[in-house]
Amino acid sequence: KLQILYTQIDRGGPNEPTFETYSFGLDTNDYFYPASAIKLPIAVLAIEKANLLKEINVHNRFEIDSGSVYKMGVLVSPDSKSGYPSIAHSIRKMFVVSDNNSSNYMYDFLGRDYINKRLWNIGFKSVRMRHRLSLQLNEKENKTTSPITFYEDSKILHHQQSRFAQLPLDVNTKNLLIGKKHYVGKKKKIGPLDFRSKNFMDLHDQHELIKRIIFPETYQADKRFNLSDDDLSLLRREMSILPRQSDYPRYAEYDKYYDGYCKFFMFGDTKQEIPNHIKIYN
């Protein structure tokens, strides 16, 4: 299966882009697993929700209670400058090395219902956010968020109780039985994997999401995210930064965290450095 969307960008003048989009094999009803691409809308919504709450910002530290899906809780982040987790630090790790735990923390901050409703309301109708990443959890556990508290020093800025998702999510695609064998944990199972309970976001919506981040001025106000210029700058910076360019966390092992580690376009099959004149946003 191969689906491609390509948009040619022409500029008639400053801030006057025009788009010409071409597709190959595009079928928005044919299921494919979005994998870590689902982290982009999660990052966008996390920044936006922090703005809406007003009492917190993306740099405030947070804690996730013990006894949740994270049995020991989430209290510290030794690889951050402050030593604590924050929305901004989580987003850095999500984009630079595709860190699943950081994405899951933002899933808990947002909640399943919030993610789906907000994305539907702004026009991304294909989205079906159903689960966290790389955790063996049942449906009830994925519907339940963990309590999370934001602090400034020792002062509590915002506390969010555990929530249970109520929004029914239908199956909106075809061909959901994929493959001939699959793994459940470490056990190999004969037969296709059933993707009816997996995340989904079609290629068209993923493509549109990128355009709204890079070219928000080309969309009407009700189709834009509630992000300031500073928010967009932060988001674009984290989308494009390479592991060797990150200070916190520091990824010193180039053989492991090479430039193409998460930049598959053009450089996904090589460990050579990406030239300075090329920036890849994903």
What does each model-found stretch correspond to?
Residues L52-G83:
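Short, glycine/proline-biased beta-turn/loop segments that scaffold the active-site neighborhood
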Residues G67, P78-F215, Y219-D222, L227:
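Active-site-adjacent helix/loop patches that line small-molecule binding or acyl-intermediate pockets
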Residues D65-S77, N121, D231-D247:
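Short, mixed-charge aromatic SLiMs
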Residues L26-P34, I91:
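A short glycine/serine-rich beta->alpha loop
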Residues K1-L26:
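A short, well-structured edge-of-sheet supersecondary motif
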Residues Q3-T7, P41, E63:
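Soluble periplasmic/extracytoplasmic beta-strand elements of cell-envelope proteins
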Residues Y33-V58, F62:
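Active-site SXXK
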Residues R196, E217, A221-N282:
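Conserved SxxK-family serine transpeptidase/carboxypeptidase catalytic domain
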